[in-house]
């Protein structure tokens, strides 16, 4: 089977997903037509196996610019025409999703086309309501051109269908989950509440800081942000709050092992890989109740969802009063949940079944 992937941003979560998917479906031929971002690794092709080839999409860019977008569509059409016998066309992220579905319609590939948003554009809270309505309109038009939409979580599917997007299926994001359970860590003194990610508006560092400041001077608790970003200044570092700065993937794992409870303050997600990685390490979850986050928490069984700072603070106070055995049990349930519902093995099975429908 020949699978062609198209993305304007071969970086971050899209890159991780494609590395995982192409390695899981290693008997298939994959061709990736890609655009670059500032955080696209040098020699990105070395991250993929021998079953993958890459084509650089030089006109691709994130922002809506009609002239540049027309050039990107023309280049994409040219590249797709050079690839014989395409079995599956899979589009990743919003811009590739729009241009790719137009191209699919023009080339007669609409029934072989799948679109994976990696986070729905109109879920964004960093744009005006008017712009969100514009994004919904664009998605509806593109949806009519071609293909099936793949939501990476049930809550993302619900958001899509509630806004008039049709022909949506769910395949949960997945990660490599070790067959052997992790060594569960007794919560320390202080208990470390930590998160992983770029410090951006989406991740809501203001809320993270607000929660942390409530516990200022309380030596029972510490807060850790693993990562860096343009809004680092919104997190007030102190003896209680540490920001690691940019670290390697191996260092991320080492820091994450030090965390007792994974804390997310995100405003929106698709289905966050960092949360799944924390679950695979047996971490209890304390997550904001946004799209994507809500799919990972079984309330009271592997952690808690909260709506605002007051609820988040109350949940931390509850965890501080809980016995170490209770916190360990929350972590064990996290591992079982990720192993059952969010593994690469399950993702591979579901994608194979989806592609075989064609």
Please provide the spans of the model-predicted regions:
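Short hydrophobic beta-strand element within catalytic cores of glycosyltransferases
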Residues: 284-287
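Conserved donor-binding/catalytic core segment of Leloir-type glycosyltransferases
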Residues: 4, 186-203, 209-213
């Amino acid at each position: 089977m020949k699978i062609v992937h198209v993305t304007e941003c071969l970086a971050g979560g899209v890159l991780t997903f494609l590395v995982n998917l192409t390695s899981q479906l290693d008997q298939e031929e994959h061709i990736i037509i890609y655009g670059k971002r500032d955080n696209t690794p040098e020699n990105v092709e070395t991250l993929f196996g021998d079953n993958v080839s890459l084509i650089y999409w030089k006109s691709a860019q994130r922002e809506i610019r009609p002239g540049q977008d027309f050039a990107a569509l023309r280049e994409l059409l040219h590249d797709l025409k050079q690839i014989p016998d395409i079995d599956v066309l899979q589009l990743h992220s919003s811009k590739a999703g729009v241009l790719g579905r137009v191209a699919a319609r023009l080339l007669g590939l609409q029934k072989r086309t799948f679109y994976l948003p990696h986070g729905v554009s109109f879920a964004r809270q960093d744009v005006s309501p008017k712009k969100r309505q514009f994004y919904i309109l664009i998605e509806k038009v593109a949806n009519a051109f071609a293909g099936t939409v793949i939501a990476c979580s049930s809550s993302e599917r619900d958001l899509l269908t509630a806004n008039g997007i049709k022909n949506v299926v769910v395949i949960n994001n997945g990660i490599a989950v070790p067959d052997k359970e992790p060594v569960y860590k007794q919560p320390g003194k202080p208990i470390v509440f930590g998160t992983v990610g770029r410090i951006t508006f989406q991740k809501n560092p203001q809320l993270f800081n607000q929660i942390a400041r409530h516990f200022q001077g309380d030596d029972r608790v510490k807060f850790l942000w693993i990562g860096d970003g343009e809004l680092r200044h919104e997190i007030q570092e102190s003896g209680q709050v540490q920001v690691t700065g940019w670290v390697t993937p191996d260092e991320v794992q080492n820091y994450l092992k030090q965390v007792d409870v994974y804390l997310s303050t995100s405003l929106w997600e698709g289905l966050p890989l960092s949360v799944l990685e924390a679950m695979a390490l047996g971490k209890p979850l304390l997550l904001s109740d946004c799209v994507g986050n809500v799919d990972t928490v079984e309330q009271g069984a592997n952690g808690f969802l909260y709506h605002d700072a007051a609820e988040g603070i109350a949940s931390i106070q509850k965890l501080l009063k809980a016995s170490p055995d209770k916190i360990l049990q929350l972590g064990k349930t996290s591992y079982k949940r990720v192993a059952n519902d969010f593994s690469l093995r399950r993702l591979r099975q579901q994608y194979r079944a989806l592609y075989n429908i064609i």
